[in-house]
């Protein structure tokens, strides 16, 4: 997780620098598609991974994130571990990953429309992470969260993340029919993690 966080930090630094130096040379649509979108995603992923790093590293009563229980089912562990490195590389052999947040949707206006939708959904995903606060964790129960994004739905991060994956799969589907079945497999794994 620390690796992801630092990678996102360095990506953010590069995207921020590129955005500042290139702002005046692009039309607004091109600037959005080339720089702004990547900058926003870098910020979202950096904040998300920073929260989870903190949640994994620190556990204390005064943080209200003491582990109350650990998932004791084999299926809970299997489905959770299958989604994260290094095990996700094995999962990807059976369900090849075809989704890509940075994919092009065709012309500039389609890109803007779908990328705004992706930003909205990933903002919901980030809102869910922030709602967890110091309780961020994947395989431990640190208390039921019923505030923030969790006030509206039980698994807002899983729902928004899966919707982003399906949206970014749209350009791939015309050339790769198996991508549809593969994404059903990934969505099923996240459904199993949620129940």
Describe the role of every protein-language-model region.
Residues 155:
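Short, conserved phosphate/pyrophosphate- and ester-handling motifs at nucleotide-, phospho-/glycolipid
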Residues 142-150, 159:
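Alpha-helical membrane-protein architecture signal
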Residues 1-139, 167-195:
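Membrane-anchoring alpha-helices and their flanking helix-loop junctions
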